[in-house]
Amino acid sequence: MQKQVTPRGRPLGATTFEVEPALAFGAVVRALRTADGVGQEALAYQAGIERSHMGKIERGEHMPTLAMILRIANALGRSAGELLLETESVLSEQQNARRQSQATDS
């Protein structure tokens, strides 16, 4: 009897986080940063994060940890709660737009 080999790791293209919240959080961070006239590198430095990592966060390619969210919020001069409320607002708007689109398609 042959032993069945199970592939290790996650499937190609799979992520360990939900993409929509990551995209929304990144969009909020980018919008606040640009509204404040702060460059990505400056924000990353103030938050103690590599610039390339900050870019991944803003593009929704990485979901930051709670500690990182707190540092980003502090660097933006805002609370983590404000960032998360804005993120929830973006997600809600996207969900409403999808519902309206589906309703008009029917």
Residue map of PLM features:
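Short C-terminal boundary/hinge segments that cap the last helix of small helical domains
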Residues: G77-E93
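DNA-binding alpha-helical recognition surfaces that contact promoter or target DNA
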Residues: A27, A31, Y45, K56, ...
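Short alpha-helical DNA-recognition segment
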Residues: G37-K56
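Residues that mark the N-terminal boundary/hinge immediately upstream of a DNA-recognition element
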Residues: V28, G39, T65-M68, S79
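Hydrophobic micro-packing sites on short alpha-helices
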Residues: M68-A73, L83-L84
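N-terminal flexible/basic segments that precede or flank functional cores
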Residues: M1-A31, A35-D36, E41, N74, ...
